[in-house]
């Protein structure tokens, strides 16, 4: 499942394998999914924002919306039917409201009369929107909160030593409600132990961090 480490690793390792074996533009990797797959789109992209050029969650819910700020450089295309009886439209509207408040880039499509089914007629619109987006691989502003439990890169930063803490979901959603998390959102407790905020301004790099002991910054000419 997407909320388990093995599920997240499966997605990330699949991306790495395809990029290694095929002629893939790393700045044009996109993630989309429907229903529980859309929950996974939110979850995986928020935890790994530096990988994706854009995402399109369809009829899903952002189960770690307290970390939605990680999508600073990841445009979002939210699609949801207003008659969805499995994942209520309130989930999409809530995510839209949070992105609006942050002034992040997003597109919102609420389909009148659409129930909990995949909107096949919107496939070309999604693909065309993806085609217009390219990954921001070297941003001047970085915000990340969440899992840094292993040595990893966040854009042009590499975290090498951290204060250990648990960041995976404490308990999975009940099997009876894997599609609809609206009534079970309290089962999710995400630890925001690690946090990084970096801003490049007037030839200065301002770094604020929480529970990160050491990090490496890989600078480049256009950064400073």
Language-model features: locations:
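Acidic catalytic loop of the alpha/beta-hydrolase fold
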Residues: 83-88, 116
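Alpha/beta-hydrolase-fold serine-hydrolase catalytic core, especially in secreted/extracellular enzymes
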Residues: 101-107, 112-224
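Catalytic nucleophile loop
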Residues: 37-41
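A conserved short beta-strand
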Residues: 50-61
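Short alpha-helix in the alpha/beta-hydrolase fold that links the catalytic acid
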Residues: 88-98, 218-221
